[in-house]
Amino acid sequence: MTDASLIGTPFIANRRQILGGVAFAAAGLVSMRATSAYAAGAPAPAPAVPAFGPTSGIDRGTIQRWARDTWASLVAMTDPRTGLPADNISGPLGSPRRSGYTSPTNIGGYMWSTVIARELGIISASECRQRLTQTLTTMKSLKHHLPSGMFYNWYDEANGNVVTVWPEDGSKIYPFLSSVDNGWFAASLMVIRNAEPGVAELANSLLSKMNFGMYYDKNARPGIAAGLLHGGFWDAQPAAGFTMGNYLGNGPDVYYTLNHYDIHVTEPRIASYIGIAHGQIPPAHYFATQRVFPDSCDWSWLEQKPVGVHRTYMGIDVFEGAFTYRGMHIVPSWGGDMFEALMPDLFVPEASWAPRSWGINHALTVRAQREFGLNDAKYGYWGFSPASRPGGGYTAWGVDAIGMDPNGYVSDMESTNFDAGFAGCRVGANPNPTWGDGVVTPHAAFLAMQYEPAAAFNNLVKIERKLKAYGEGGFYDAVAVKSGLIAKRYLSLDQAMVLGAIGNVFCDNVIRRNFIKGDVQSTIRPLIGIEEFGAGVIV
């Protein structure tokens, strides 16, 4: 059993105090040189101070009800013959309309949610074990890429077949193997093998064959001492947009995506963590992703100019830049959403293991989302993350001011874009937007609960009671706050994030405790602990 003290307490970075403690900049590992005005007159990062009791001001009965209803939606999504959850459902839980497709991420989310349902007393230990055994047995039978052990992105949840025709519109699908989706599936295997010993052998039989080195391109950034992960690959030639190769040298060449994941504050870092922990990817890869893009005019398509300093870790120059928002410096994600920033933190206790980087940035990301929703946009509610679109479809929701995407992860139905400009290079196109019908996504507020528990809880209570965005399967996926339009469906991943957050806050970090056993703690904790982000409260 992993001692919970090894995980530590999440940190809040909203006090104007000086960060004390041990200096992590060991000789040979970290060096720094200033660049831009920020380096000369920058505020020191705000401290990471221990959070107050994680359940202060929260009614446990309400949490239990939310968890029970959320679990009911996942049960309704899951095909009883295969144990595979659909991507989403609509309609009553007694006769749900399942999507006809699922992914490794969805399957992983269902499995870790099963453990949490057991921990909360919603299901028995025997039911937990039976459900996990059924799902894992099905996974062992699914077609997958044998040389790497990776799974395809889309399967039919009713029979386990690889999806080649999209159920919603009949379009052709080229079966794809995603690095990030396989990352979430592997993360779930790592949780359940420790949380439920009765399925450890089955889980390990799948996990032991998954090699994330298949995605690692050591030459992705010429002149940099480490590489990046591809978005994924096809094992049969797609229509276009690929480069051939095979980084493992095992089996025939595959068709890699042209893109790599090159941004730090985004969800693919879960695949990086697992690959590093298992010795499949070099640790220096962690520092090859960019915290923010450079502050030169070549990058002036960014919606604001970053400020920061350069530091060197493991021989790699890292621009420790940040965006400025409401008196804070925040290392941005691509879209300014809660999912990219905080979902990996459900598994890796980033805030406590890396108090000078994630420990500051996560808390400020949550604060920025809250202040944006309540103070800037004046929506009256907060929590923004990719989810269903009220009225139909799917939209990447976020807080544009803390995201790098020039088109913005929008926060309202009108797709209002923020653009502060890039000082010295171009003026802003919309530095002071007028916000419209804001869309909040409940799973984002649940992710925030580990950093602002009472505020997140109260926000969710309002979403349920005032916006009526709640059904028999828990919170609906999204709601527009002015029109009251609700996306009345449940997405399996979003429901799994809800239960993942509840599990960590109310079940003694159950996801983290089981994920970090073994190689994760010994490899990832010292690696991420040496870094200092450019994040902090401006003083």
Listing of model-derived features with the role each one plays in the protein:
Residues 1-13, 23-32, 36-38:
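N-terminal secretory signal peptides
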Residues 11-12, 32-58:
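C-terminal segment of N-terminal export signals and the immediately downstream linker at the start
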Residues 47-539:
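Ser/Thr/Asn(+Pro)-rich, low-complexity disordered segments
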